Amino acid sequence: MRITIIAVGKIKEKYLKEGINEYSKRLSRYCKLEIIEVEDEHAPDNLSSLEEQQVKKREAERVVKRLKEGTLLVVLDVRGSKMSSEELARKLESFFISGKSHVTFVIGGSLGIDKELLNMADFSLSLSDMTFPHQLTRLILLEQLYRSFKIINGEPYHR
């Protein structure tokens, strides 16, 4: 099983890097994990709606260039499907059972994800009704993927 996470922007905070490294290490027991960072666009607070769309489009173009053919594409979006940890585990398991051995998760930049990239997705996932910084989202996703593999394998961790 292969999981790729394509994330817009670099992680700057040490505590996030440490958490991401820890869960990446834990996940290596269950899957081949690759994390790809693509450059984010500078986005001042006072962008017009059109400028925001242009920023998201440029970021999406960078993401699309890194997608591998045949991967199942899961985009993280606030309007995506909301799931419990158990439901996410079953969804992930169903991807692998259906013959999809490579799943790619995309985390957009601070402005979100371009609608064309959303339309390309096989599945859209929301981690919460709350809004998180996109850097923190990477750590939360990794923890939930680790939790999912523990659930799938019937191993202790999930409570």
Swiss-Prot record:
Enzyme class name: transferase
Q: Please provide the record's keywords in A-Z order.
A: Cytoplasm, Methyltransferase, rRNA processing, S-adenosyl-L-methionine, Transferase
Tell me, what's a Pfam family for it? SPOUT_MTase
Q: Which GO terms describe its cellular component?
A: cytoplasm
* Any one Gene Ontology molecular-function term assigned to this protein's record: rRNA (pseudouridine-N3-)-methyltransferase activity
What Enzyme Commission number(s) apply to this enzyme? 2.1.1.177
Q: What is its main location?
A: cytoplasm
Detail which positions bind S-adenosyl-L-methionine.
L76, G108, L127, S128, D129, M130, T131, F132
Q: Where in the cell is it found?
A: Cytoplasm
> Per the record, what are the reactions this protein catalyses?
pseudouridine(1915) in 23S rRNA + S-adenosyl-L-methionine = N(3)-methylpseudouridine(1915) in 23S rRNA + S-adenosyl-L-homocysteine + H(+)
Nucleus recorded as keyword:
no
State the InterPro entries in the record: Alpha/beta_knot_MTases, RlmH-like, tRNA_m1G_MTases_N
Highest taxon of source: Bacteria
Cross-referenced NCBIfam families: PRK00103.1-3, PRK00103.1-4, tRNA_RlmH_YbeA
Q: Which HAMAP family match?
A: 23SrRNA_methyltr_H
Q: Tell me its family.
A: Belongs to the RNA methyltransferase RlmH family.
Its quaternary structure?
Homodimer.
Its biological purpose is as follows:
Specifically methylates the pseudouridine at position 1915 (m3Psi1915) in 23S rRNA.
- Kindly provide the name given to this protein in its UniProt entry: Ribosomal RNA large subunit methyltransferase H
